[in-house]
Amino acid sequence: MLQKKKYQKKSSKIIINKKAYYNYFIEKVFQSGLVLEGWEIKSIRSGKVNISESYIINDRNEMYLCNCLIEPLQMSSNRFSCDPTRKKKLLLHKNEIDFLSLKKKNTGYTMVSLSLFWKKSWCKLEFGLAKGKTAQDKRINLKKREWEQEKLKILKKTKETY
């Protein structure tokens, strides 16, 4: 019998917002769909997207991704206007929208986009409920990371000697 070839699953992440992990404490992570136009999907497939300064707002009980820059391709049709920074609607359940709007309003959280990824043929957004870090928090994080790297180096040296 012929065996089916097992294919390696490639990373489906399109772009990761590393700045968000540096500037915010991420409390909880959510996934949502995006309402996109055809030219936006083509631009995302070619990698012309930037989410480093993007955030999520609540407008009339609907969530929108703001300040996400999707550059239009040169070969796009001129029949319609391409607004690179338009608000993109997030597809979330009603209870998720209520939970997020309550957290944002009462406790001072913000919603920051973390990454864009493909799920089958759909483009999805991963965003987090976050609180801002102070300069002191950032320094503490940096010291922890440096100490972890130093520990790994020490362990590596001790393994080589034995």
Curated annotation (Swiss-Prot):
Keyword RNA-binding included in the entry's annotation? yes
Task: Specify the superkingdom.
Answer: Bacteria
User: What processes does the entry annotate via GO biological process terms?
Assistant: trans-translation
**Keyword terms:** Cytoplasm, RNA-binding
Per UniProt, subcellular location reads as: Cytoplasm
Listed GO MF terms = RNA binding
Q: What is this protein called?
A: SsrA-binding protein
Family according to the record? Belongs to the SmpB family.
Summary of the function given for this chain in its UniProt record = Required for rescue of stalled ribosomes mediated by trans-translation. Binds to transfer-messenger RNA (tmRNA), required for stable association of tmRNA with ribosomes. tmRNA and SmpB together mimic tRNA shape, replacing the anticodon stem-loop with SmpB. tmRNA is encoded by the ssrA gene; the 2 termini fold to resemble tRNA(Ala) and it encodes a 'tag peptide', a short internal open reading frame. During trans-translation Ala-aminoacylated tmRNA acts like a tRNA, entering the A-site of stalled ribosomes, displacing the stalled mRNA.
Q: What is the lineage of its organism?
A: Bacteria, Pseudomonadati, Pseudomonadota, Gammaproteobacteria, Enterobacterales
**Record keywords: RNA-binding included?**
yes
Matches recorded under PANTHER family: SSRA-BINDING PROTEIN, TMRNA-BINDING COMPONENT OF TRANS-TRANSLATION TAGGING COMPLEX
| GO CC terms in record | cytosol
Instruction: List S-S links within the chain.
Output: none
